[in-house]
Amino acid sequence: MTPCLFLVLTLIPTLACLPDSPQNPQDGTLGSGAASAAAAAVDQQFIADILSRIARTGAEVGVAFRTLDGKMEWFSRADDVFHAASTMKIPVMIELFHQAREGKVKLDDPLIIKNEFHSLVDGSIYTLDGADDSEADLYKAIGQTRTLSQLCELMITVSSNFATNLLIEKLGVDNIRATVTSLHADGMNMRRGVEDNKAYEKGMNNTTTARGLLILLEAIAKGRAVDPDSSRQMVEILTRQKFNDAIPAGLPPGTRIAHKTGDITKIHHDAAIVYAPRPFVLVILVRGMAELKDSAALMADIARRIYQSAKQNTSSGPVATSKAIE
């Protein structure tokens, strides 16, 4: 049987079969408090529009969306594993604030800037090339110091790989992994620093799922990632993100958004807390599109549709689900 997407509403037993899609989101769920057939129709179109838009690209796309009130959600290929690209910098930031709370470090502690890092494969030394990084000024500071908070700012807002690796070596990969586990973000698998070519050649990469990133961002948004004050500071850092051509481009001008992007060859992600009238977390992972402008446009379109659906659906009833079934 052709896979169909069925919307099952808790209050009104409405079933709707949507067109098939190459996405075939076996775990696809849409939840909302909608308590009417009219609301169900809106939700059906919401799903159909997004899946149709994705199908036209031929890309593999993972989406995880949930309002912070927990009353509306949608997942499509949310447990598919993707190369994490620079979204892996989110757990590094969380671990920095975790160790600061534990008294192991202070955010204003100075760290000597040195371009020497250890490969996951054999512990051998490798270096980064400023020409391949999104931020070059830090390479001019080798031998000087920067505070941990300054490095965190560079890591998140301009996605500095150099700052990221300095923080990873300071904090420890195992500690970062343990904190991710404590937050139950099972889809995020943090293994190594950036540009570890020996590890990359052996397929030893940082990976994530859309659901895993959503769990981390929800923890930050709800003040649970470390503690409320640390979470607030992390949100503020994420709002200063300089790369805003994906999810933010699909939102109304002036919408506050705290997010982290990431991209490598044919990989482009955006993971966001969106402070809309009905706040939500949205994670979009894209694999297989050669041009960043095209994947950015796709993510903006998805964000636009989700923003409108969340805005229109203001009901507060029980959660509904939809699943692709054979």
What are these regions (language model features)?
Residues 60, 143-148, 152, 158-217:
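Mid-domain, small-residue-enriched loop/turn segments at the edges of structured enzyme/sensor domains
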